[in-house]
């Protein structure tokens, strides 16, 4: 946002996913809320109309869908691991909801530099299929180059992702 001198609003929660999270709530449940844990609090989407929306979700899902004994896995999926169609549809529905809120925005569906983008990962393909299914020329995919690490991205890795996103926006979106 600083690079483009743009207004910035962020909706984020550590450990959150689209289909399952490390905590009880998933992003599709809290996105429309003013207060994440209050299901009766509704955000007024007319208050802010972004030109660009960047979505960086699915990293937490990549781990949790493989942990069948985790309480949140059991809560969301019972004893059955979600299949590719379920994951793609969940992502697609979330992005379709964003489009309904932001009908003119460019939406960038991204994955960060953690293991969701590791060579051989299926998750970029899930995002690509979901976006293709939307048939919306203003919804894009952009995947950050994988950076091997044993932890969350450090300052330099965050800068690398910012640089990658800046370049993508500058070359793809009529800003």
Residue ranges and their predicted role:
Residues 1-80, 85, 106, 115-121, ...:
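Conserved SGNH/GDSL esterase-like catalytic core that processes O-acyl groups on lipids
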Residues 2-6, 94-106, 133-137:
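A structural motif corresponding to the C-terminal end of an alpha-helix
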Residues 40-48, 96-102, 172-175:
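Surface-exposed acidic, glycine-flexible loop patches that form ligand/cofactor-binding
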Residues 56, 110, 144:
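A cross-family glycoside hydrolase active-site/sugar-binding cleft signature
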Residues 87, 91, 158:
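Aromatic/hydrophobic pocket-lining residues that form the small-molecule binding cavity
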Residues 91-96, 127-128:
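Generic structural signal for well-ordered alpha-helices
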Residues 142-148:
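Short glycine-rich catalytic loops that host catalytic nucleophiles or stabilize transition states
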Residues 150-175:
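Histidine-centered active-site loop/cap adjacent to the catalytic His
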């Amino acid at each position: 946002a600083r690079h483009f001198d743009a207004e910035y609003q962020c909706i984020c929660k550590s450990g959150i996913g689209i289909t399952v999270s490390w905590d009880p709530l998933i992003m599709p449940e809290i996105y429309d809320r003013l207060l994440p844990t209050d299901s009766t609090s509704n955000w007024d989407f007319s208050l802010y109309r972004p030109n660009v929306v960047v979505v960086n979700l699915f990293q937490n899902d990549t781990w949790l869908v493989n942990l069948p004994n985790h309480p949140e896995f059991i809560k969301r999926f019972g004893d059955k691991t979600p299949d590719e169609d379920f994951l793609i549809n969940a992502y697609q529905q979330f992005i379709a909801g964003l489009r309904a809120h932001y009908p003119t925005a460019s939406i960038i569906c991204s994955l960060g530099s953690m293991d969701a983008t590791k060579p051989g990962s299926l998750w970029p393909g899930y995002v690509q299929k979901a976006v293709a299914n939307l048939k919306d020329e203003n919804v894009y995919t952009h995947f950050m180059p994988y950076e091997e690490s044993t932890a969350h991205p450090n300052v330099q890795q965050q800068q690398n992702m910012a640089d990658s996103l800046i370049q993508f926006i500058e070359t793809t979106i009529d800003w």
